[in-house]
């Protein structure tokens, strides 16, 4: 069981303010190439995804995350012309991270690339992350955490994971929450992967601002995206991080 964070009150406001202070003092940091894989399985209760609990002493510590991490030089894959293949390299990194962090095997040929996330400039560490999804290969009982970067794991239905965030039991970064929110509509792995395969991968370059209700993450198409002003009129494509309930809006035509 993944343990929840202590001191939940105003944690999103506090985290954003700390990020903003760091940005004011040090400026924007360079993007770090990274990859993650959402490992899925079918159960009698529906689709479940593997959630890992990050060590509180490292980047994104204490949060519920998917297997993943930075892309290493050793992950590099070359195309048929001998040039670096960015997507294949990211997939190789995701496979490696799943094995290292949780002893989980995924088939790189069966993974679906469905999103890429670019963090806002305010973040102190900025991982530009390829998001893949894959069905679990083998026995779910074979999951074994590394007990270093990862301190616990749990299989969760996506809606249960977001509900537990709202209840203060776990913490989720916006890309994780958005992915779980997307997966919550599916009852089986085949349906989720088929829709991801059929759609163009989504690109999220996040802009973030503070409001009285909580931090707001905005993406392209939101009326406040270009000016980084969440009060601007227009369409909404954003996640408002209210303490007891994250609220996603997308009314783009």
Located regions from the model:
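N-terminal leader/linker segments that precede catalytic domains of diphosphate-processing enzymes
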Residues: 1-150, 156-253
């Amino acid at each position: 069981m993944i343990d929840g964070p202590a001191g939940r009150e105003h944690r999103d406001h506090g985290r954003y303010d700390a990020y903003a202070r760091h940005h004011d003092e040090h400026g924007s940091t360079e993007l770090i190439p990274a990859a993650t894989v959402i490992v899925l399985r079918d159960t009698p209760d529906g689709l479940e995804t593997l959630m890992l609990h990050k060590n509180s002493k490292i980047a994104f510590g204490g949060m519920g995350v998917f297997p993943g991490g930075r892309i290493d030089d050793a992950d590099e894959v070359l195309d048929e012309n001998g040039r670096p293949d960015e997507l294949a390299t990211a997939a190789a990194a995701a496979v490696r991270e799943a094995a290292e962090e949780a002893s989980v095997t995924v088939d790189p040929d069966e993974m679906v690339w469905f999103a890429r996330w670019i963090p806002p400039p305010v973040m102190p560490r900025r991982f530009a992350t390829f998001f893949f999804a894959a069905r679990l290969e083998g026995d779910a009982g074979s999951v074994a955490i590394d007990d270093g970067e990862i301190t616990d794991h749990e299989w969760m239905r996506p809606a249960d994971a977001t509900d537990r965030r709202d209840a203060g039991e776990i913490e989720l970064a916006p890309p994780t929450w958005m992915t779980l929110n997307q997966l919550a509509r599916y009852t089986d792995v085949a349906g989720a992967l088929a829709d991801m395969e059929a759609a163009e991968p989504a690109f999220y370059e996040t802009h973030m601002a503070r409001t009285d209700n909580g931090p707001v993450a905005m993406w392209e198409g939101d009326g406040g995206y270009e000016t980084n002003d969440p009060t601007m009129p227009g369409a909404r494509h954003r996640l408002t991080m209210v303490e007891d309930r994250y609220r996603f809006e997308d009314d783009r035509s």
